[in-house]
């Protein structure tokens, strides 16, 4: 009998934790990560020709 109550509580907790959540927080975090990735990508694009030129001078 106690097992049934415990099983029911575990199932309810799993449904609450794994159910649909508000995407607002996750969406904001994803946008911040995407923005940081774009900044890094743009910085690499700007810096790569400079680094290639320095390497060519060293040879």
From Swiss-Prot:
Location within or outside the cell: Secreted
Residues with the Leucine amide modification: 57
One Pfam entry name: Cecropin
Predominant subcellular localization, coarse grouping: secreted
Signal peptide region: 1-23
Transmembrane helix is among the record's keywords: no
Keywords, ordered alphabetically: Amidation, Antibiotic, Antimicrobial, Immunity, Innate immunity, Secreted, Signal
PANTHER family reported for this sequence: CECROPIN-A1-RELATED
Protein family (similarity comment): Belongs to the cecropin family.
Function: Cecropins have lytic and antibacterial activity against several Gram-positive and Gram-negative bacteria.
Protein name, per record: Cecropin-B1
Species for this entry: Culex pipiens pipiens (Northern house mosquito)
């Amino acid at each position: 009998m106690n097992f049934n109550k415990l099983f029911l509580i575990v199932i309810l907790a799993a449904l609450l934790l794994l159910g649909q959540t508000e995407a607002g927080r996750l969406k904001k975090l994803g946008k911040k990560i995407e923005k940081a990735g774009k900044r890094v990508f743009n910085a690499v694009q700007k810096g790569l020709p400079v680094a290639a030129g320095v390497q060519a001078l060293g040879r």
